[in-house]
Amino acid sequence: MKSLLLPFTLVAATIAAPAFAECTAPIFTVTVPDGAKATKEVMVAAQKSIKELNTAVTDFTNCLLTERDAKIAAGGDNLNDAARQKIAAEYTTRNNAAVDKLTKIADKFNLEVRAFKAKQPQG
C-alpha cells in the first residue's frame, strides 16, 4: 500500500508546489548620444529606446510584484510578519536597482536634449 501512495504523494506535491516565474531584469544597453553633435534622427531614436526601456522596467516591476505576492501567499500562515517583510524587501531591492538605472539613463538623456536644443538655430 505504501508503494502506491508514494507516487500519488509526489504528484500531489508537484502540483501543489508554487510556480515562481523568474523575473528577468531589463538589459540596459541604451546609448545616450552627445546632444551637441547628434542629429535629430539620432536623438529621436535614443528617445524611442528609452521609452522601450521604460516599458521593460514597468513590466519587470509588475512581474516582481506578482512573484512577491505569490511567494508570500505560498508561505501562508507559516510566514510571520518579519518573513513577509524580508520577502518584500528582496523584491523592492531588485525593483529599485532597475528603476535607478533607468533614472540615470533618463537624466543623462535629458541633459543631452538640452545640449541638442542649445545648438539649434534661434529663429
Which residues make up each language-model segment?
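N-terminal signal peptide c-region/cleavage motif recognized by signal peptidases
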Residues: P7, V11-P18
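Positively charged n-region of N-terminal signal peptides that target proteins for export
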Residues: M1-P7
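Compact alpha-helical subdomains of small soluble proteins
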Residues: E67-G123
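Alpha-helical structural elements
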Residues: I15, C23, K48, T55-T58, ...
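Immediate post-signal-peptide N-terminus of mature secreted/exported proteins
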Residues: A19-A73
